[in-house]
Amino acid sequence: MKEVKAIHKYAKTSAFKVRLVANQIRLKSVDEALNILSFSNKKAAVLIKKVLNSAISNAEHNDGLDIDELFVASICIDEGSTMKRIRPRAKGKANRILKRTSHITVGVSK
């Protein structure tokens, strides 16, 4: 069956943190996945929920699939670019702060 995808690039959270939430909804039905994401307290849950809703809308509008039969066929979290920032420290030194980003790809199928 055809897989319908939605992608969110350069999400401002690390891939490790997003994967913690993504592993909970992999291969679940869409209704169950949305329920899990609704009750999660993590920022990544909000990001994944937006991408999942977009994938559901794509499946319904573009391919005419029935929402009740959909499940999360694939969810892929890749590392995005890393922004490097400087934090001043004592005695004229500086530490590097890494602002990590991630790419969230959600695929739904029948």
Swiss-Prot record:
The UniProt keyword set, sorted, is: Ribonucleoprotein, Ribosomal protein, RNA-binding, rRNA-binding
Q: Name one GO molecular function term.
A: rRNA binding
The keyword Ribonucleoprotein belongs to this UniProt entry's keyword annotation: yes
- Gene3D superfamilies linked to this entry: Ribosomal protein L22/L17
Q: Please list the GO biological process terms of this entry.
A: translation
Q: Which GO terms describe its cellular component?
A: cytosolic large ribosomal subunit
Pfam families hit by this protein: Ribosomal_L22 (PF00237)
Matches recorded under PANTHER family: CHLOROPLAST 50S RIBOSOMAL PROTEIN L22-RELATED, LARGE RIBOSOMAL SUBUNIT PROTEIN UL22M
Quaternary state and interactors:
Part of the 50S ribosomal subunit.
Family listed = Belongs to the universal ribosomal protein uL22 family.
Q: What is the protein name stated in its UniProt record?
A: Large ribosomal subunit protein uL22
Q: Which organism is it from?
A: Ruthia magnifica subsp. Calyptogena magnifica
